[in-house]
Design a protein with these regions (language model features):
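Glycine-rich Rossmann-fold phosphate-binding loop(s) that bind the pyrophosphate
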Residues: 11-12
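Rossmann-like NAD(P)(H) cofactor-binding subdomain of soluble oxidoreductases
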Residues: 90-147, 152-155
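N-terminal Rossmann-fold NAD(P) dinucleotide-binding loop
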Residues: 15-16
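Rossmann-like NAD(P)-binding element
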Residues: 59-114
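Aromatic pocket-lining residues of Rossmann-like dinucleotide-binding sites
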Residues: 22
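Mobile gating loops/cap/lid regions near enzyme active sites that modulate substrate access
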Residues: 155-183
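Conserved N-terminal Rossmann-fold NAD(P) cofactor-binding segment
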Residues: 36-72
Length: 183
């Protein structure tokens, strides 16, 4: 297996699940966890180290800083604050996430990072574009999950309602990840 180093920024609900999924699937050789809450990082690192003990592969899990991300192949951006979304509008997080992105992207790029960035943070399309512009990376190196989750939800519901296996359903959500998307 090619050695792959992945950094996960933001260890809330989504970031912690991303890290766990990467550990269990064994598709990374090293995982670096970064969050402003050091106690959260320490807890997640220990939980992930414990969780992989029965997996058929070993992943090195480490706490880190933005400076430790320079040699990552991929960074997954999960920074956000769901408490700002009282109205269930993903745009409510925008001022917080814009400020966070502008702060951390400079630090990450100063570390020599030249890998790929996958953005999950809301509002996904706006933040993905901002990461691309702030990083100076080529367009093909910055991705957003966009309506991927919404597409999964649609296919799941169609499968449950029709009895057709989800693997046999081709359906997509398009548009902005939010109220303006459509099937």
């Amino acid at each position: 297996m090619k050695m792959r180093k992945v950094g996960v920024l933001g260890l809330g609900h989504v970031g912690a699940h991303v890290a766990y999924s990467l550990i269990i699937q064994g598709i990374v050789s090293e995982l670096v966890l970064v969050d402003l809450k050091e106690s959260k990082v320490a807890s997640e690192v220990q939980d992930l180290r414990d969780a992989q003990m029965y997996a058929p592969h070993k992943v090195e899990v480490n706490p880190g800083t933005y400076a430790d991300l320079g040699d990552c192949d991929v960074i997954v951006n999960c920074i956000g604050d769901i408490t700002l979304c009282a109205s269930n509008n993903r745009l409510d997080e925008m001022s917080f996430t814009v400020a966070q992105v502008k702060s951390y992207v400079k630090k990450v790029m100063a570390s020599g990072f030249n890998g790929y960035i996958v953005n999950i943070t809301n509002p996904c399309d706006v933040i993905t574009d901002l990461i691309w512009k702030e990083s100076g990376l080529p367009k093909h190196k910055v991705f957003g999950t966009g309506t991927g989750l919404d597409t999964s939800r649609l296919v799941s519901k169609l499968s449950l309602q029709t009895g057709v296996a989800h693997q046999s359903i081709s359906a997509y959500m398009i548009g902005e990840h939010g109220a303006s998307q459509m099937a």
